[in-house]
Amino acid sequence: MKYIIAIIQPGKLDAVHEALGAIGITGMTVSEVQGYGRQKGKSEIYRGAEYVINFMPKIKIELAVETKKASEVIETIQKTAESGKIGDGKIFALDLKDALRIRTGETGSTAL
């Protein structure tokens, strides 16, 4: 199993959600987060004053999938979330040792 974490632009969430649903993904966790990468925030001018925004708003998507499905999920997120601009985000794939469905006690990939 793989645990996939994607950090994407907030405006891309609906498209990514729809695209993942189209390939059979039935669940994920979504969080509003803040962070920065190479762009290190940005400066904006508001009413003549310059403001530095150090942390950019992002969306974090987390999902657990069977190993054989991981490449398809990663490719789907990448293609859907890409705008070609700085700040598009990152995708991380980690090995997932086990999962447990609390309600039924199922473990492993059947718990997904």
Regions found by a protein language model. Give the residues of each.
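Positively charged, small/polar-rich N-terminal and surface patches that mediate targeting and assembly
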Residues: 1-112
